[in-house]
Curated annotation (Swiss-Prot):
UniProt cross-references to SUPFAM superfamilies, sorted A to Z: Obg GTP-binding protein N-terminal domain, P-loop containing nucleoside triphosphate hydrolases
Name this protein carries in UniProt: GTPase Obg
Gene name of the encoded protein: obg
Highest classification ranks of the organism: Bacteria, Pseudomonadati, Pseudomonadota, Alphaproteobacteria, Hyphomicrobiales
Record localization: Cytoplasm
CDD domains per record: Obg (cd01898)
Molecular function as annotated in GO: GTP binding; GTPase activity; magnesium ion binding
Known role: An essential GTPase which binds GTP, GDP and possibly (p)ppGpp with moderate affinity, with high nucleotide exchange rates and a fairly low GTP hydrolysis rate. Plays a role in control of the cell cycle, stress response, ribosome biogenesis and in those bacteria that undergo differentiation, in morphogenesis control.
Cofactor(s) needed for function: Mg(2+)
Family label: Belongs to the TRAFAC class OBG-HflX-like GTPase superfamily. OBG GTPase family.
One annotated Gene Ontology cellular component of this protein: cytoplasm
């Protein structure tokens, strides 16, 4: 399945049905009076997170979503049927923005979370509502209120426990493929990875999710290379695994380049716990390995792990280090709860009238 992390959609909730103008007509009842029913409420447009999705590709083929209108009221005080709701199914981690792409509407981080993006219009009052002591036979009714129409942007930030960062050809995809069942594209040229990949790693019977993003080069925050547009996918991670290829001529400079790009991107990425590893060490002899390990340690201020996805050396130790930090971070954070948003009570008002949720002002 192709990966898409941003999509534009057009939504419209349903219009409310019009109220009915009707009078009771029965044999031997001379003055039956008005009995026009209210119109039905228009359908809402909802967004809901579901399990099993990690892309917004479906919204490339369908961008328009429209709920149905409420039906008109009928005689004998019959209320029209409500319109059917429309629900957009999105992956966990999806954010919804206004058309300006900056105003955040909601951030959906829990499976099963729902949010109403557009409320349907209220149905109009039937003429039975307008009967008074001085007007026993009103011959008018309220039209239904129009629904809401919006243009929105959907932006996906993948939910993962650990994020892999580094320069192109640092061995991130090879690492992911060796410790998970993910099968990212692997080749010996820069920018083989063009979109994020996810995989589930297991160590000592504990599972956690790894996210591999395309490599960063100098100037990525200014759009050089693929740029930093995929860094949003590691914003939610607990820890970053920074891989530096042992094939780099200057491993210290390679580390600092990526670190600078993370700082330029912002969003507290550099505040996350970081594990540094010298990867692809199987290509070095002992003397060269010792030299580059010392150089990298000086640049990052800590002793880096030495790993090789080909031989398996150091892989278990790195996974355990990742697991320990993830467990510690999860223990400090309270479990997330699904925010609840209840349906509005059905209220009907004249156009332009302010109506509260409790329907206290629903009289015309």
């Amino acid at each position: 399945m192709k990966f898409l992390d941003e999509a534009k959609v057009y939504i419209r909730s349903g219009d409310g049905g019009g109220g009915s103008v009707s009078f009771r007509r029965e044999k031997f009842i001379e003055f039956g009076g008005p009995d026009g029913g209210d119109g039905g409420r228009g359908g809402d447009v909802w967004v809901e997170t579901v399990n099993g999705l990690n892309t917004l590709i479906d919204f490339r083929f369908q961008q328009h979503f429209k709920a149905t209108i409420g039906t008109h009221g009928m005689g004998r005080n019959r209320t029209g049927a409500n319109g059917s709701d429309v629900t957009l199914k999105v992956p966990v981690g999806t954010q919804i923005f206004e058309e300006d792409r900056e105003t955040l509407i909601c951030d959906l981080t829990v499976e099963g979370q729902r949010y109403c993006l557009a409320h349907g219009g209220n149905g109009g009052f039937g003429n039975a509502h307008f009967k008074t002591s001085t007007n026993q036979a009103p011959d008018w009714a309220n039209p239904g209120l129009p629904g809401e129409e919006k243009t929105l942007w959907l932006r996906l930030k993948l939910i993962a426990d650990a994020g892999l960062v580094g320069m192109p050809n640092a061995g991130k995809s090879t690492f992911l493929a060796s410790v998970t069942r993910a099968r990212p594209k692997i080749a010996n040229y820069p920018f083989t990875t063009l979109h994020p990949n996810l995989g589930v790693a297991t160590i000592d019977e504990r599972e956690f999710i790894l996210a591999d993003i395309p490599g960063l080069i100098e100037g990525a925050h200014e759009g050089v290379g693929i740029g930093d547009r995929f860094l949003g996918h590691v914003e939610r991670t607990r820890v970053l695994l920074h891989l530096v290829s042992a094939q780099e001529e200057k491993v210290g400079k390679a580390y600092k380049t990526v670190k600078h790009e993370l700082e330029a991107y912002g969003n507290e990425l550099t505040d996350k716990p970081e594990i540094v590893a010298l990867s692809q060490i199987d290509v070095l002899d002992e003397a060269e390995l010792k030299k580059k390990t010392k150089e990298l340690a000086k640049a990052c201020g800590k002793t880096p792990f030495q790993i090789s996805a080909v031989t398996g050396k150091g892989m278990t130790e790195v996974l355990r280090a990742l697991r320990d930090i993830i467990v510690e971070e999860n223990a400090e954070e309270k479990p997330a709860k699904v925010p609840k948003q209840r349906h509005r009570d059905i209220v009907v008002a004249d156009e332009g009238e302010d109506v509260g949720e409790d329907g206290a002002d629903d009289q015309p």
